[in-house]
Amino acid sequence: EVLSTLDPELGSLVTAEVRRHGAAVLTGSTVTGIAPTGGGQWRVATRSTSGDAEGTFALVVVCVGVHPVTDLAVAAGARLGQAGAIVVDESMRTGVPHVWAAGDCVVTHHRLLGTTWLPLGTTAHKQGRVAAENMLGGSKVFAGSVGTQVVKVFDLVAARTGLRQHETGPLEVSPLTRVTVADDHKRYYPGAVPLTISVTGDQSTGRLLGAQIVGQRSAEISKRIDTFATALHAELTVDDVIDLDLSYTPPLGSPWDAVQVAAQGWERAAAAANQAAVNQAAVIG
């Protein structure tokens, strides 16, 4: 799909939004060549399982990601870790005396995965604050990230925090994911729109592991993903999310907010899966 950072079920909603605005979406294609044709135009050649194709465009945007730039740090004696990023401790020290580092060039403490590399602006700002305070003699510690992200695609907003099910491999958990569709506010009040919410949790303990949300821009997607992010930071269970005292007025929400409706859906799915496991064990026994 267009937004591969989401599960396909939610990513397909983003793909549909792009197509709704008249754009052709070619996934599973490899760009094999880009060449100027004159007159400010560019010819782009692609290859996929369905064959080769070409198109002419006025503008070509190439997005190939980022990588850490570490030459200066390596020359100073710093060590490199995941993805070639600079190894730092929780105080953002590099191990080289009087040298701190922060941002996209350093490894990141992920509150679920441990040490990883997660180049995000929000993370960089927090790390920079920690590094600056400690340079001045402080004792600040970076509390860690849960990878919260949000993006606007035309009239749609997509967000995620924590882990998707396939990303939980390094953890000793029994991951379960449930997708729920819930309205952003009470349906009897005009303008209600659906949110598609995916919740991932540990089927054994109920611990929240991650969430994804896709919905219209008016539906406070960023606020709702931040609710899940806060719960992840505090190591809450999915049941704890259901118990949160969240704000409510009919134009803006429901007595059970959409995030809580999704959490309830996950709880029912987990209970059913656990009961099925018990029944299976009884049959085998």
Where are these regions (language model features)?
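A short alpha-helix-loop-beta-strand transition element characteristic
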Residues: 79-82, 138-149, 173-174, 178
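Rossmann-like dinucleotide-binding cores of NAD(P)H-dependent redox enzymes
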Residues: 1-33, 118-124, 141, 146-166
